[in-house]
Amino acid sequence: YTKLLVEKDELKERCGPRAATYPQVKINGELIGDYFAFQEYLEEAEPMLLPTMNRFTVFPIEHENLWALYKKAQMSNWTAEEVDVSADMEDWKSLTDNEKHFIKYILAFFAGSDGIVFENINNNFADEVQLTEARSFYAYQVHNEMVHGETYSKLIDKYIRDSAEKKKLFEAITTIDPIKKKAEWAMKWFDNSRPFAERLLAFACVEGIFFSGSFCAIFWLKKRGLMPGLCFSNELISRDEGLHLDFAIELFKMLQNKPSQDTIHEIVREAVEIEKGFIIEALPCSLIGMNAEKMSDY
């Protein structure tokens, strides 16, 4: 992001009408326009989204806060093969129908939502954000999300024997209304016609609000000594998602053009209400001995 050496008025004075014939500028495939439109774009654009030649090399590190999170993610690598679910099957047989319903909905939500998160990073954020440190982190997060999705799919495949039910759970973002509502909200706010800052905040809400109730519920199973494979995977994934949330917040703090306070409140309020509805209605806490009011407060 380099200051232009020739101001608009000076250029007009030097070149007159010919200034309008300057080559048309495109950035990331988007037509910006002529020289004057390009100047206006630079004045209004978010600096971290502006392409620079620095993005092609890792060093020198300019944003130590982002780099530290990338290195932390790098050190926490794991694979789906590390999760042993063999002992879970005996516990699964002993669970009540309500408890099984509870776990099925959690796994179904996670299996689909990780795909939405993956697509948003891969198709949007990783391409838009030009900071080397952020691009490094997103490369690792894409890997994380694939491992998470594989793990949740593996758990569904292991626990559920009926092929029709299994198919319904794998397609939960279109077949199960409470999960569909969460997916639709995420895709609404991830739409790349929206300002980057709004999309980044909504992304943080998915990782920090939409996931939190389900993580908490699985930790409740661990407290009861049930489903060790599921609980171990939950520890690994919740740790990863906590780091992803920290990164989104750190990046958001660096933005020069943040959403209005009203928009911020709207995004967070919607996310909280949807998650409260999901955790109380789709996952009826009271049916398995959890306190729905306390979960809602959480």
Language-model features: locations:
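Short, structured active-site "lid" loops
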Residues: 13-33
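Short coil/turn linker and secondary-structure boundary residues
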Residues: 3-6, 33, 259, 290
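Thioredoxin-like thiol-disulfide oxidoreductase module
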Residues: 2-20, 44
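Non-catalytic, surface beta->alpha helical segment in thiol-disulfide oxidoreductase systems
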Residues: 27-47
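Short amphipathic alpha-helical segments embedded in low-complexity Lys/Glu-rich regions
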Residues: 2-6, 26-28, 141-142, 266
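Alpha-helical interaction elements in eukaryotic regulators
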Residues: 7, 31-38, 230, 244, ...
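Noncatalytic linker/hinge segments flanking ATPase motor cores
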Residues: 13, 37-44, 179-184
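Non-heme di-metal
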Residues: 48-298
